[in-house]
Amino acid sequence: MTVIMMKQLVFFIVITVIASCGQNEPLTNYEPKSPQEQALKSILLDFQDGVNTLDAKKIESLIHPKASLMTGRERKTLSKEEYVKILPKRLAGNPFIALGKPKMTVSGDKAEVKIYMTRGNYNGLVVYNMILEDNKWYIQGWKY
């Protein structure tokens, strides 16, 4: 192996490690950088707990009334009202989830949280759109 090839290999490994940072680190280990991030982390931990304890009411309380939520392999978008109707069945039919280390962008009363979610054999990026209303953060939508 030539020196140039060796340098390229090392560079590729370093980039891969940097790109995957946070994917396997749990949300519980995330250190928020602001009170807003702390509140968002709490909402996401509550969401994770609600899914894992099959608590549809807990999840419902985290979702904004005007939410638009992506669901299923077909990536159909549902209102909160539509989603809540299918939620108990979805919870019963899916494995537990684990949320990873997030990347949060907060701007006024809106926030975007990019986070890896593991569910069974699936590990993929989910983008949560959050909204602050009456001093409380809500999930306004998500996509994957």
Per-segment meaning from a language model:
Residues N123-Y144:
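Short beta-strand edge/turn micro-motifs at domain boundaries
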Residues T53-K66, M70:
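Short, well-ordered alpha-helical segments enriched in acidic and aromatic residues
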Residues L9-I18:
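Sec-dependent N-terminal signal peptides
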Residues F47, I59, A67, Y83, ...:
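Hydrophobic pocket/interface hotspot
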Residues E81-V127:
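Surface-exposed, charged secondary-structure patches
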Residues S68-K76, L91-A92:
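A short gly/proline-enriched turn/hairpin at secondary-structure junctions
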Residues C21-T53, S61:
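Short, low-complexity N-terminal intrinsically disordered segments enriched in polar/charged residues
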Residues M1-V10:
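Positively charged n-region of N-terminal signal peptides that target proteins for export
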